[in-house]
Amino acid sequence: MLERMIDQGAGREPADIVLKGGRFFDLVTGELVESDIAICGDRIVGTFGNYQGKHEIDISGRIVVPGFIDTHLHIESSHVTPHEFDRCVLPQGVTTVICDPHEIANVLGAEGIKFFLDSALETVMDIRVQLSSCVPATHMETSGAELLIDDLLPFADHPKVIGLAEFMNFPGVLAKDPECMAKLKAFQGRHIDGHAPLLRGLDLNGYISAGIRTEHEATSAEEALEKMRKGMHVLVREGSVSKDLKALMPIITERHAQFLALCTDDRNPLDIADQGHLDYLIRTAIAGGVEPIAIYRAASVSAARAFGLFDRGLVAPGQRADLVVVDSLEGCHAEIVLSAGRVISEDLFAARKTVAPVGRNSVKASKVSASSFRSHSNSGKTRAIGIIPGKIITESLEFDLKVGPNGVEPDFEKDVVKIAVVERHGKNGNIATGFVHGFGLKSGAIASTVSHDSHNICVVGTSDEDIAAAANRLGEIEGGFVVVRDGKVLAEMPLPIAGLMSAEPYETVRDQLRVLRHAAEELGSVLEEPFLQLAFIALPVIPHLKITDRGLVDVDKFAFVGN
């Protein structure tokens, strides 16, 4: 193969594939270059010249850019398997993703990571895996599994593994927790991904000094700039709930691009269908005034180099032939996509080997009743979690709520309704209740087994009866999403693979999500993405007030607090 690449690059024999008649975006100079692009096997072998090809593709009037790289995501949050995610996202130009399977790992442990690694060997796109570092994320919740360093080391040398995934337990790092230290020491010299929302100053210095190189939780340009100036690559995030692109646009410049990359973290097929994936981030950034050279560098070459993938990210000889033919830099609509030199088609997807799903019957919660969700307050005021639309950071609020015969009651005029978390792994049967502000619900309940990071049942509702009905229905369908009103199911989407992923094609999941959103709106929901917004209310590593199966958590103090 090496001899063939040399001969085809030198023009001594026809290349396997030649893209002819178009221009490519040179991310070194920012120029649009008229040139053929020659490909041998999975590599680019020729640019800045004219080539003959065994197979020639006319791309007149089009522009070729490097394949896009999503540097941090949880495929499980797309609610489909890795194979279906491949079908969903690769045609939009995303040729490499760097995933953290900690959603399925929190439910199934090492079995979940193995499922992802097995799947990554069979997909058309290049799925790289970071080993989940914090399972569970904290001691303040009940997960289905625990991963210690001895559970991770058997996977460390897998060809798809880059390093250690987002180290969410930054208090544990700063406190030099022994298990945190064991994981960090084992992966020194390899890539360690970060997760440190609002961490600044000297504590940030200490965290970075543990060997952590990248971070995706910056929600302001000021925070992002501090992290970059201290040596981190900042991953600009725009997901279905966490929408930080607009706030970070001021630092997406040609000067800063080498220290930036793009990620989605959590993005579902409905948003991908309606808006796009990384292509949406690129279009949105350029429309907002970002220079194309800056955002395309962040989407490809800067992302690749941040994670040590030096074989991709440029349209240049010797680089992996991950290429996207787009209509224009501003439009960024993929018309042809090549992954490792292969033109993407349904036939290519159909030829993949399948991987047997895991994690069936993972919802082991006992049946609950309305009386399981009575709530009491120890003072005249009741704490409530304040939703901030488009953010996973929440507010810690207090309200004067009435006390009825069944405890503290919701107040619809104040947009305060009840929230509950039910342990679903069969460990202890914990149930915690609290209140939340910002959903807009006037009736019914919404429930989910997608509930970061331990993925217990999380329910928000206006009555204890509907909360119980929704929670029980999730057990009957092996997990997923449910919308209930007056005890009747208005819409549901089963996620039988670990209570996180569907066994259906992504098109079916997309359509089911549309029905679910409409049903949530019928209950009064004012949120653009109520289900993933609900999923982050139980995540006790994101400020400020959260709820787990063990109770309300003041994340700033890393302590439980009363209602």
Curated annotation (Swiss-Prot):
Source species, domain of life: Bacteria
GO BP terms in the entry: adenine catabolic process
Record keywords, A-Z: Hydrolase, Manganese
Catalysed reactions, as listed in the record: adenine + H2O + H(+) = hypoxanthine + NH4(+)
Classification via CDD domains: AdeC
GO molecular function, one term: adenine deaminase activity
Manganese in keyword set: yes
This enzyme's EC code(s): 3.5.4.2
SUPFAM superfamilies hit by this protein: Composite domain of metallo-dependent hydrolases, Metallo-dependent hydrolases
Cofactor: Mn(2+)
Pfam families documented for this protein: Adenine_deam_C (PF13382), Amidohydro_1 (PF01979)
Keyword Lyase found: no
Family per record: Belongs to the metallo-dependent hydrolases superfamily. Adenine deaminase family.
Protein name: Adenine deaminase
Gene this chain is encoded by: ade
